[in-house]
Every structure is written in structure tokens, then in C-alpha cells.
Amino acid sequence: MTKEQTWSQRFESALHPAIARFNASIGFDIELIEYDLTGSQAHAKMLAHTGIISSEEGEQLVAGLEQIRQEHRQGKFHPGVDAEDVHFAVEKRLTEIVGDVGKKLHTARSRNDQVGTDTRLYLRDQIQQIKSELREFQGVLLDIAEKHVETLIPGYTHLQRAQPVSLAHHLLAYFQMAQRDWERLGDVSRRVNISPLGCGALAGTTFPIDRHYTAKLLDFDNIYANSLDGVSDRDFAIEFLCAASLIMVHLSRLAEEVILWSSEEFRFVILKDSCATGSSIMPQKKNPDVPELVRGKTGRVFGHLQAMLVIMKGLPLAYNKDLQEDKEGLFDSVNTVKASLEAMTILLREGLEFRTQRLAQAVTEDFSNATDVADYLAARGVPFREAYNLVGKVVKTSIAAGKLLKDLELEEWQQLHPAFAADIYEAISPRQVVAARNSHGGTGFVQVSKALIAARAQIDQ
């Protein structure tokens, strides 16, 4: 890299080629080019609007920037190896197109407020895309749940069977997680959508700019009130990475369950060929690569969040070159979340089939109805703790005898406590166990049906 940089006039010697490569960000911040062009067009219009440059010059700049946009979209814009970053690459090409007037674009602007603007425009756009993908993911969850209101599945605590639940209820738990993710991104958007443009390098500018004018052109809700804060703030990126990490947590939890459910030990779901792979040595294998990759990629997003926190923790005001390191992790996190949402949505919609007969069997082969025996006694006046202790002994005795609760004779029940009657068998049937939990937010069929209606209304708004 031997050509002069825009800032090189103060220096007596050229930048060492290895240092130039180390310093350059064009290899990754080219991702921001569309946003850099949009922000620069708004800046050019503002310069003309305030009389800092002429209207004709403003029009030339806007047109030249639009030409670069078209060149980029057509694959014809190729920044040279001497381009330090996307900002210099655009300015260099603009000057080639419109001549010396292109050198006026950077009036009253620093790369510090410029890159902050670009990054916010990029992230604002990506957040909307992720929110749309979340809605699609939620929609698929509801499509499946609506078919399985009365399909029962074992519910677990400590990965031990606890109580049976409606499969729809189980899926709605993930819907609610995704809803919080969707809302959280909306919260982040409000702090992303603040304009730093016009903050300059750190202290503002001597030119009579109109920051509100550019903010309006770029659809920002407000402007930074402090120029030092405006150029050095990356809270918005950290907040996004926190939200992205939580999205991946939720996807990873679902992925883990799909992996378990598809195993021979569970056999709750069948993975279809379109969303599974095989083994290079074991011909019988069908591997759950999609959920495994989602589970694995979660660590990438966590890592980018941690990296950003470490970058920011010791930075004095205002801009520091460390902030160049905010982008690759941010870009990768955005791409990882979008790809993971898409993959899990496809897996649910096209690659997964619940084995309803196996699920029906699974909810009858354990003691997950034991709580309902205690509830049965409590409803008949027996103190719950006394009933709880009694049922614990019954379970212990039944296990020793190789029986389930449903296998006990009525005489055996009544020997345990006279409150037991013939209706105990209905009370502890899996279907009744689920139906009886009719409290708001519970797994009872009536409540689940109401929850599905409410959830559908949420995403249809």
C-alpha cells in the first residue's frame, strides 16, 4: 500500500505495508456501503440546504453517490487495495465521478460520526429483518400447536418426567420466548435510531449544520445531545448483541429438545430426510445436524457480546481505533441469528413429524400423575402435605411391586385412605390430568385454546 492516504499530508513517510493491512477495515466494512451512501446523500443535501455548499454541488454529490450505489449493485464497484475503509473508498470514487466537488462531501463531518451513522442505519435495517423472521418462526410454532392441542407429551423438570402437558402448551412456551425477543428488539431499536451525524470527530463543528434536518432525512427519531457521547457510544450494539444472544438461547433450548426427541431413547419425533444428514461410516444413522449447528452457533454470538463488552470497558472518551473491532462480531451475529432462525423455521415446518402414538404411550408409563393423587385427596379435605407424604409412599410401594398407579385395585386405594373412590382412575388418566390444569396460563385444553387465539392475534396485528 504505497499510495497516499487522505490523512497522509501530516506525515513524512508512507505507512508500512503490513501496518496498512493491519489498519484497514475495507475487507469487512464494505458491508456498510449502502448505508454509507445513504448517509452521505443526506449529509450532502444538508450541506446544500444550509448554504455550506451550493445547490448545484449538492445535486452533483447526490447523483455521484447514486451512481456508486448502482455500480455496487451491479458488481462494478471494486475498491482498490489502497482503500483504507469504505468511507475513503466511496469518497475516492465520488471524486473520480464528479471531480473536485467530491472533495467537499466531507465538510463538517468526521469518519467518527459517519461510521456511527452507517452502523446505526445498518443495524436498524437488520433488526427489522430479524423481527420479520421471528414472526415467521412464531407463525410456524402456532401452525403446529393448533394441530396438537390434545396431543399429550411428558413434561419435565430436571430432565425427569414430571407432569404431562399438551404439546401445544409446550410449543407455546417457545412462542412466548420469541415474543419477548421480538419486543426486546423493538426496545433496542429505539436506542439504535438516534443520529450521531454532525457530532464531528468529537466536539461538533464550526459550520452552521442542521443535525435535525439530516436526522429527518434518514428517519432517525432524535439526535445525540452530546457530541462526545455520539461518536463513542456503542451501547446500542451491545444491547443488540444481548438481544441476539437471548434469541440464540431460546433457539438453542428448542434445538436441544429436538435432538433429544429424535433419539432412540425418546423417539418423540421423526426427522425428515430434507433436514437431516447421514454418517460416512454408519449407514443406519440420521443425524440432527440442523439443531446441533444452531446449538453450536449460539456460542459465536455469546462470544461477540463478550468481545464487545471487553472492547468498551476501558475506552476513554471519545473515539478510539478499538471501535473498529465492533463490526465483524456485529455483522457475524446478525448473520448467525438470521440463518439460525431460518433453519429452525424450515426444520419445524418441513423437517419434523411428531410421533403421536409414541407420545400417547409415553404419558402412561410413569408416575407423572402422582401430584394429581395428592390433589384428589386435598380436594376431599386431606391436608396437602399429608396427602403428599401418603402418595410418596404409594409410589415407592408401586415401584417395588412393578406397578403403575393406574394398575392399583380400588381396594388397594381404599386401604391407603378411605377418601379414594372409583373416580380416582379418571382423575389420574393422562387426559384428565392435563385437562384439570385449567388455571390461567396452564396446560388445560380450554386455556391452551385461549392462548392460541391470543397468540395468533399478537402476530397478526
Curated annotation (Swiss-Prot):
A Gene Ontology cellular-component term: cytosol
Matching InterPro entries: Arg_succ_lyase_C, Argininosuccinate_lyase, Fumarase/histidase_N, Fumarate_lyase_CS, Fumarate_lyase_fam, Fumarate_lyase_N, L-Aspartase-like
CDD domains assigned: Argininosuccinate_lyase
Main location: cytoplasm
Pathway terms, separated by semicolons: Amino-acid biosynthesis; L-arginine biosynthesis; L-arginine from L-ornithine and carbamoyl phosphate: step 3/3
Keyword set includes Lyase: yes
UniProt record, GO biological process: arginine biosynthetic process via ornithine; L-arginine biosynthetic process
Keywords (A to Z) from UniProt: Amino-acid biosynthesis, Arginine biosynthesis, Cytoplasm, Lyase
Locations listed in the record: Cytoplasm
Record EC number: 4.3.2.1
Enzyme class: lyase
Entry superkingdom: Bacteria
Name of a matching Pfam family: ASL_C2
Catalysed reactions, semicolon-separated: 2-(N(omega)-L-arginino)succinate = fumarate + L-arginine
Gene3D superfamilies found in the cross-reference section: Fumarase/aspartase (C-terminal domain), Fumarase/aspartase (Central domain), Fumarase/aspartase (N-terminal domain)
Molecular function as annotated in GO: argininosuccinate lyase activity
Keyword Glycoprotein annotated: no
Record-linked NCBIfam families: argH (TIGR00838)
HAMAP family: Arg_succ_lyase (MF_00006)
The family this protein is said to belong to: Belongs to the lyase 1 family. Argininosuccinate lyase subfamily.
Record-given protein name: Argininosuccinate lyase
Taxon lineage: Bacteria, Bacillati, Cyanobacteriota, Cyanophyceae, Nostocales
